[in-house]
Every structure is written in structure tokens, then in C-alpha cells.
């Protein structure tokens, strides 16, 4: 089987924690779950991350990422704008929305600095506010990364960031973090498959119903002591 090394290294670049888009400063409600006592050790951290990954990310953010990628591939700029707006509207708290806007803006700066695209990059720059989902799907398309592989990289970055937040906020040891990362990483193919099915059905199958996550994210806005911005 032929392996495209350019695609693999591009995937590594997009998924690398060294990519300067600020993901390390966010926990997406995990820190509030720790503060409330829901997450308190390695097993509860793993359960939390797994539940959010399969119950929220796979049902909403992942299919929207695929739809955005397909829109870029078709040069359907109107659909890209609509999907970006849809995703931003699905961010249920100010912290979650600010997070994706800041990271989307940062990835846009990288794309501009590295010359990732011509006319399409101009179209990306015109989207304001710009979500990370839209910017990342664009970068994957421009770098000739297959859709499912780009989504896998996007998902791995999300998982890795959640594990890193657990290490800092609970705290956990490095080995415990790698154990959790390994177990949840193995769920990526299942997540991609579900996301593909939902994306094929359009927005009617996109579902981000997660009241506990929204409540915890709201509480985090006024949490007395915290390490993360979300």
C-alpha cells in the first residue's frame, strides 16, 4: 500500500501541540468538572473525556468539520460561511465560543504566514468571526489531506488537549495520561465512521445536546480559581 509521506507530515504538523494556536490554555469545561468533583482521578477523567468525545464531539463538531471540508473542496463558499455560523451558534457559552474564535484566528495567521492557499485563503480571511473548525478543515483541504485523515488529526488534537488538561488540573501522572490517551485514541475510527454517516445526512443529524457540559462551562466563567480559559 502506497503511503503519502507529505500527507503524513502535514497531519503531524496540524496535530502537533507545537502548532501555536493556543489549545493548551483551554479545557472545554473539564476544569469545571474537576472543581465540582465529577472528575477526580484517572478513571473519572478517562470516562469524562470518552463521554464528551463520543457523545458530543462525534455527533456535532466532527460531522460539521466533514461538511466544511466538502464545501471547501467544492469551492462552495456560501456553505462554508453557513457552516461556520452554525458551529459558532452551537457553542453554548461565551467561553466555548471565544475559544474556537481565538484558535481559528490563530490558525488563519499561520495559514497566511505560510502561504497556504491563494483565492481560497482570501475567502477564509473574509470569514469573521472564524471558528477553528472552519480554519482547520480549510488547512486540511489545502494541504491535500484526505477528509477522514484530517478529521482524525483534528480529533487527536482534541483528545490530547483534554488529557493534558487532566494532567495539570487533577493532577495526574504522565503514565496515567498516556494510558488514557491510548484508550481514547483507539476510539477515533469509530468516531470518524459515525461522523461520516451523520455528515452524509446533512445538518438534520447534527446534535450537540449536552446540558451538563453547558452548565459546567457556564459555571467556569465565575469559578474562583482556575488554570484554563474554558
From Swiss-Prot:
Question: Where is the protein localized?
Answer: Cytoplasm
Q: What are this entry's molecular-function GO terms?
A: nickel cation binding
> Which superkingdom, per the lineage?
Bacteria
InterPro entries annotated for this entry? UreF, UreF_sf
Please indicate if the UniProt record lists Endoplasmic reticulum as a keyword. Answer: no
The alphabetical list of record keywords is: Chaperone, Cytoplasm, Nickel insertion
The disulfides recorded in the entry are none
The UniProt entry's GO CC annotations, sorted and at most eight, read: cytoplasm
The protein's assembly and partners:
UreD, UreF and UreG form a complex that acts as a GTP-hydrolysis-dependent molecular chaperone, activating the urease apoprotein by helping to assemble the nickel containing metallocenter of UreC. The UreE protein probably delivers the nickel.
Question: Which family is annotated?
Answer: Belongs to the UreF family.
* Entry function: Required for maturation of urease via the functional incorporation of the urease nickel metallocenter.
From the Swiss-Prot or TrEMBL record, give the protein name: Urease accessory protein UreF
Which organism's genome codes for this protein? Polynucleobacter asymbioticus (strain DSM 18221 / CIP 109841 / QLW-P1DMWA-1) (Polynucleobacter necessarius subsp. asymbioticus)
Amino acid at each position: 500500500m502506497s503511503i503519502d509521506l507529505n500527507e503524513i507530515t502535514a497531519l503531524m504538523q496540524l496535530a502537533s501541540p507545537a502548532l501555536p494556536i493556543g489549545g493548551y490554555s483551554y479545557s472545554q469545561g473539564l476544569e469545571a468538572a474537576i472543581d465540582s468533583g465529577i472528575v477526580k482521578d484517572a478513571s473519572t477523567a478517562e470516562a469524562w473525556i470518552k463521554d464528551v468525545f463520543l457523545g458530543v464531539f462525534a455527533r456535532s463538531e466532527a460531522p460539521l468539520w466533514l461538511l466544511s471540508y466538502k464545501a471547501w473542496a467544492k469551492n462552495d463558499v456560501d456553505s462554508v460561511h453557513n457552516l461556520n455560523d452554525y458551529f459558532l451558534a452551537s457553542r453554548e457559552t461565551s467561553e466555548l465560543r471565544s475559544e474556537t474564535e481565538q484558535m481559528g484566528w490563530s490558525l488563519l495567521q499561520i495559514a497566511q504566514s505560510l502561504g497556504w492557499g491563494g483565492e481560497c485563503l482570501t475567502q477564509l480571511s473574509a470569514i469573521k468571526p472564524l471558528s477553528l473548525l472552519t480554519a482547520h478543515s480549510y488547512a486540511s483541504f489545502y494541504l491535500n489531506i484526505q477528509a477522514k485523515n484530517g478529521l482524525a488529526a483534528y480529533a487527536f488534537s482534541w483528545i490530547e488537549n483534554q488529557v493534558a488538561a487532566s494532567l495539570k488540573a487533577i493532577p495526574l501522572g504522565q503514565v496515567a495520561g498516556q494510558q488514557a490517551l491510548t484508550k481514547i485514541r483507539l476510539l477515533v475510527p469509530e468516531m470518524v465512521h459515525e461522523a461520516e454517516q451523520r455528515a452524509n445526512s446533512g445538518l438534520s443529524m447534527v446534535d450537540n445536546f449536552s446540558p451538563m457540559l453547558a452548565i459546567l462551562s457556564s459555571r467556569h466563567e465565575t469559578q474562583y480559581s482556575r488554570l484554563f480559559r474554558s
